[in-house]
């Protein structure tokens, strides 16, 4: 049995580790969250940059998500792209990657977009830009959030600064 170093380390440190038992516990948490109104989305299995990977890599990654996560969350038709990427520019979705994801059951596509408003509603999909609200954004670009709240009033002065820049 060959496995990634990280998973192998878990087995070494916890010889009674049971993936089935962990999945059972995760499903209970997901079910409780859904009962409270939470919705779940894919962020891809391996935090993939869908704008840069090939179709075959996207297919393999999506299948891993569907095999390992969908059974826990009951499936999802929402995908939130990592790395601020998208399937294309502002034009309508098209191409092999879109057709594959659409065929895999996704209807809602979200990218990370710092603009104040971006929604594209089409017959086959709903596309929305979203803004990340995190310490990095609040520290380096508070002006991008000023229409939502006053960053100075919520940024904890005890928080260690400066926030490390991303590479």
Please provide the spans of the model-predicted regions.
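Alpha-helical scaffold elements lining the catalytic groove of polysaccharide deacetylases
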Residues: 15-39, 45-73, 90-93
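Generic structural signal for hydrophobic
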Residues: 2, 32-33, 101
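Residue-level detector of short, conserved catalytic/binding motifs and their immediate flanks
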Residues: 8, 38, 77
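A cross-domain feature marking catalytic cores of carbohydrate-active enzymes
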Residues: 9-12, 42-44, 80-83, 113
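C-terminal active-site subregion of NodB/CE4 polysaccharide deacetylases
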Residues: 52-167
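Single conserved hydrophobic/aromatic residue that forms the stacking wall/gate
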Residues: 1-11
């Amino acid at each position: 049995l060959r496995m990634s170093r990280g998973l192998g380390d878990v087995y070494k440190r916890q010889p009674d580790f049971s993936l089935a038992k962990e999945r059972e516990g995760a499903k209970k948490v997901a079910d409780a969250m859904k009962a409270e109104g939470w919705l779940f989305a894919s962020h891809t299995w391996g935090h993939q940059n869908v704008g840069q990977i090939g179709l075959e890599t996207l297919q393999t990654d999506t299948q891993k998500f569907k095999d390992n996560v969908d059974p826990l969350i009951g499936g999802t038709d929402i995908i939130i792209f990592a790395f601020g990427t998208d399937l294309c520019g502002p034009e309508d979705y098209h191409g092999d990657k879109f057709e594959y994801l659409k065929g895999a059951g996704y209807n809602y596509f979200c990218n990370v977009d710092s603009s104040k408003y971006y929604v594209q509603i089409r017959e086959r999909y709903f596309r929305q830009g979203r803004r990340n609200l995190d310490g990095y954004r609040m520290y380096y670009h508070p002006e991008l959030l000023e229409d939502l709240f006053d960053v100075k009033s919520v940024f904890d002065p005890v928080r260690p600064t400066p926030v490390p820049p991303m590479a």
